[in-house]
Amino acid sequence: MVWEKSKEANINYLSKIVNIQQFEPHPNADKMKIAHVDGYNVCMGLDEQPGLYVYFPVNSTINPNILSYCNLYRDCEKNKDATKKGFFEDNGRVTAIKLRGTPSEGFLLPYEALTSFIQDSLNVVVPEEDVTNIEFDTFTYNNKSFWISKKYIIPVKSYPVSNQSGRKRSVKRFNRVLDTQFRFHYNTTLIKKEPWAIQPNDLISLTSKIHGASSIFAYVLCRKPLTILDRISNILTGKKWSENKLIYDYLYASRSVIKNANYNPNPNPGYYGIDIWGEANKVIKPFLTKGMTIYAEIVGYTPDGKYIQKNYDYGCVPPENNEYVSEKNFKVRVYRITYTNIDGITHEFSAREVQQWCKNNGLIPVTELYYGFAKDLYPDIPINEDWATKFWERLANDKNFYMECNSPECNNKVPHEGIVIKKEDMHARAWKLKTYAFLNKEQLELDAGELNIEDNA
């Protein structure tokens, strides 16, 4: 048996086995205490003892069989022991909650409770071994997999579509995308998972995290459909009959779907039924040079006057008279640029290069809030083993960066999403620090069953 990360796992929603040996008293509640998991605080009852726990992050969902076995459902009828009552709703989602003014960010389940479930329900003996700090979402045994937790996504109802037009001619699809040329954006890690990732002497960039639709625009090598003449040419030049011809071409995508991957079909309009990515592509495409990929956020309104993200206008106004104008009805803000050569080797623009390239070429990057050494942001914090803890506590509440404030870029009063942190070390990675106000807004939307474009685009 083994604890594993599935192929679909999102790094921010993995469960983690932790060894909790110390607690802090809750500042405002005599019957609670606080455990620390990386950069997170988790409120617990006074009776909880030191030992191994499984940490489940906020907005992950726990397997219903585990919740039932451990009697954690609020609905007693769902629990193994119907006389016991927990606090999880039917969806099994882990929520952040302020308890007497102190945020509790996640849920800790005794490791023994999880192993007892596995032994009793799956008939698998969990060996005694050092499992501290293992991250996982799946338990694998006897060539079988059992999911433990995953990111909570609102289920989308699907409805059968009747074919009223009779038999339709099928369209042959040709996928032109080379996975060595086009790359989706990496998952941005929650900094509270890795508070040690930034050290005092690191050169860092802080930019505003804005709430819109992720997008990718690329001018990279693609496959070209072969004509009869191309195939004959292949034979005459000693190549395989079906060997693809490569050309530079334009691609654009949402966070997880390439909209024009195929030559023949019309681009996929996606979540909105309207191709906002195609509209944004018209803005970015003229600036792309061979090998370049630009990653950006689209904010404001859709062509039919809906918010791209509910209530987040970013200074835009709804379109009128069938006009959809950049910087008036929607905005595109660049946050990452790469260059990929013909061999598939990618160069990552530094955070400062992204800012300068955009300004030199007439595009607008995300707002840069700070650029410099981490230690110089708050020079009064002593550089010792507690530096990271104090640094992130200070940053999480820094009004200069609009933390726990309304968005400075929106006319509507909506919570600022937070900050993106990058380290200038030529590695393709970034971290994010969200405001608690924004996290609470996300939770309320999940409770209301409101779909998120980033999960469905």
Where are these regions (language model features)?
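Core nucleotide-handling region used for phosphoryl-transfer chemistry
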Residues: 2-457
